[in-house]
Amino acid sequence: EQIQALPTYTIAQKGIGYVPEDQGIFAGLTVEENMKVAIQKDNEETNKRLDYILNLFPDLKKFWKKPGGLLSGGQKQMLSIARAYVNENELLLIDEPSKGLAPIVVEKVMESILQMKDQTTIVLVEQNFMMASTIGDCFYIIDDGRTVSNGSMKQLKEDEEMKRKYLGIA
């Protein structure tokens, strides 16, 4: 199904969550309000999921009543991911979750995404090779907007040109 021309709310209603590269949070709203804006169904199941998310991202619990604009870059990224994940979407599109984050924060975000991938399908766009190779099952190498290769990490590593040119492995 083609969804490019659909309004954002229609895409969300179809069970697709999106985490933009720029984090897309409301800086003037508290963490709690940012989460409430994202929630489509306020029911017991959503409340359980919210508890699960707050365990995945304990920093969000600490800053629950603080404006999103006061969060660090990593905390904003966690909030952005949490907002997309709270509605039990069938598909999460996550764009560059490690961009601009300190290595320790990248690790926390990566661990959280690893836990989430057991419960939902995730399409991850990521230039951080370590993060992508840890999280991913199936990989697409895109160069200048074109898919130049795809497969498992094992398959990609077997291709000497792919290793040298795209994976940064000598």
Identify the function of each model-found stretch:
Residues 138, 150:
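Short, glycine/charged-rich "phosphate-handling" switch motifs in NTP-dependent
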Residues 84-85:
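ABC ATPase C-loop
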